[in-house]
Amino acid sequence: MAVLFRDQTKSALEALLFVASEPLTVQALARIVEIDVADALELLLELAKEYQDRPGGLKIVQVSDTWQICTRPECAPYIERLYRKSGTGLSKAAIETLAIIAYRQPITRSEVEMIRGVKVDSPINTLLERNLIEEKGRREGPGRPVLYGTTLEFLKHFGLKDVSELPPLEEFLVEGETIDI
């Protein structure tokens, strides 16, 4: 790929990521700029590295099999002030429920309740409304209970490519504490 064409194509990819309201697949980006998927991926990786290596409020991230431009976490307090919404945080119960679902997915409501020791109807409804979790199917057996798991929105919100990038649970334990998984 010629240098001038390469730079123009990389600029076009950057512009597409900037204006897109949703993450875009490499295949869609390659089709739009009329290059091979492998070349598009190479340019996206270069672009992501450039954003990573320079100071600024933006970064390019891969979320599952899609790409997007997003703000750096350290800019969040300023963005929150711009879009201040009262009561947008998750409750402690919702955060605990989300953590259980993220680490144990797919998991049923009753399994979450067994771990937390309390009903989780309200936290699960909140997480569903915020599109952080979704129904992933049904467990075989009596009643065929719904299985819950995290969404692409969850991955985007926490800046993860996939759930394998979740930090190990051991990082959250106090010295001497154990956890059953």
From Swiss-Prot:
Keywords attached to this entry: Cell cycle, Cell division, Chromosome partition, Cytoplasm
Annotated InterPro entries: ScpB_csome_segregation (IPR005234), WH-like_DNA-bd_sf (IPR036388), WH_DNA-bd_sf (IPR036390)
Gene3D superfamilies to which the protein is assigned, alphabetical: Winged helix-like DNA-binding domain superfamily/Winged helix DNA-binding domain
Primary location group: cytoplasm
GO CC field: cytoplasm
SUPFAM superfamilies in the record: Winged helix' DNA-binding domain (SSF46785)
Intracellular or extracellular location(s): Cytoplasm
An annotated GO BP: cell division
NCBIfam families with a match to the protein in the record: SMC-Scp complex subunit ScpB
Family in the record: Belongs to the ScpB family.
Function text: Participates in chromosomal partition during cell division. May act via the formation of a condensin-like complex containing Smc and ScpA that pull DNA away from mid-cell into both cell halves.
Record's subunit section: Homodimer. Homodimerization may be required to stabilize the binding of ScpA to the Smc head domains. Component of a cohesin-like complex composed of ScpA, ScpB and the Smc homodimer, in which ScpA and ScpB bind to the head domain of Smc. The presence of the three proteins is required for the association of the complex with DNA.
Protein name (database record): Segregation and condensation protein B
Provenance organism: Desulforamulus reducens (strain ATCC BAA-1160 / DSM 100696 / MI-1)
Underlying gene: scpB
